[in-house]
Structures are given as C-alpha cells and as structure tokens.
C-alpha cells in the first residue's frame, strides 16, 4: 500500500501512511532540521520518511535501522523516487559504539521515538552526541511520561528488549537531563501530538485490528485535517501530549573530548 501511494504522491505519502503522529513529528523536524549540504544521521529511521525529507532539503543522509525489512523497503522506495543521497545501514543501536568509527561524524542526528526501546538510553544518547561535529545538533523525541495510553499500549511495559517499549515515557525534565549529561546544550524543547492526533491514532489502531490497514487508512484519511485543531484543543482541554522533543547542540568542550 505504501509503495502504491509513493508512486502517486511521492515521499510525502509516507507522512500519512502510518498514524497521524508521524506527520506531527515531521512538522517539528521541519522547524529544527538544518537545510543544505550537511551530513545527517537518522538513527532509527523507520519507514524512511524523515530521511527522504532530509535528502530533499540537501542533506547527505545515513539512515540506520535494526530491521532488515525496513531497510529493504527504504532502499526500494528511494530507488523508486530516484533518490541517491541516502546511505542505508542495518545497525542495532544498542551496539552503536562498535560502529562509531566506520560511520564517522555528523552535523546533525535525528533520533525520534527510539530511546524508549532500549534500557541503556543514556548510553545511546552519549554515543550519538560523540558522533556529532562541534556545534552539531541532536533532534530527539520520545513518549511523554504523562500521556494517556494509546489503544493496545502497555502503561507498564516489560524491561525485556524485544523491539517494543521498555519504558512508558519521559518527563521534559528527564529528557533534558539525559541530553545535558551527554554534554548537549538544549536550545529548544516542546511537545508533539495532542488530543486530535491521539484520538485519530486510537481510531486507526482499532479499525486496523478489525478491518485491516487499507480500510482503516481510508476511513481515517478524511478526518486528518482535524489535526489543524490539535494544538488549540489540547490547550483548552489541558490534554497531555503524546511525545516530548528537544533540540540540543554539542558543547565545544564535549566536541574536543570526542576527538
């Protein structure tokens, strides 16, 4: 289904193929990603939408995922779009330290909705920061600790690293603490995906279980423009957001230590 949409709508179709929060993350990314000829690492690239966007705005991109299937899907989609500026790697981010030398340095790193999948989250963030050039930036997002459980989501996940969440979420203070302990200066922080996006995500998950993904996607599609009301309604209702995100810049002292 994703490949059919790709032929008609291009890379942007990947932003609306999954749940509505994917588009929300891209909107945040668009405001914080450096454009132009910079080297970008997408750590935990998923369906590749953010990697494709980074390539489209001039970045030299390396996209990594532990899933060979995701990487093969990404390779096929990039070829279909005529995209040549993305290098693909199958990497278990828990073992990132073993790959640092071969991967090199980056001007910016995207790590969205990934650290909640690993027990050693602080270690992973420190490894990512060590891969940044001086004054490079890390764009980091993770589930918000106070969000309401989505349909089928475990509020008390198992600590076993099996690909699912090992942690329910992070407070903004905790995410900032992790970043600062890794020698990042946090320059911006915010929330992603409010009440509308979460309700649409729940609806899509329920419909997918009952009717399958194509039917669920078609039913939810006309409702997606309601996301324009997401921020104001979330404020009025005081509804907790789904994710917390930050942009951190590598401190000069940390840059010197990483050499």
Residue ranges and their predicted role:
Residues 197-227:
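C-terminal helical/coil "lid" or tail adjacent to the Rossmann-like core of SAM-dependent
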Residues 141-166, 177:
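Short, glycine-/aromatic-enriched active-site segment of Class I SAM-dependent methyltransferases
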Residues 118-119, 132-134:
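Helix-to-beta-strand junctions that scaffold the AdoMet/dcAdoMet cofactor pocket
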Residues 10, 154-162, 203-209:
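Short glycine/proline- and charge-enriched loop/turn segments
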Residues 113-117:
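A short His-aromatic
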Residues 1-104, 108, 112, 122-125, ...:
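Conserved N-terminal segment of class I S-adenosyl-L-methionine
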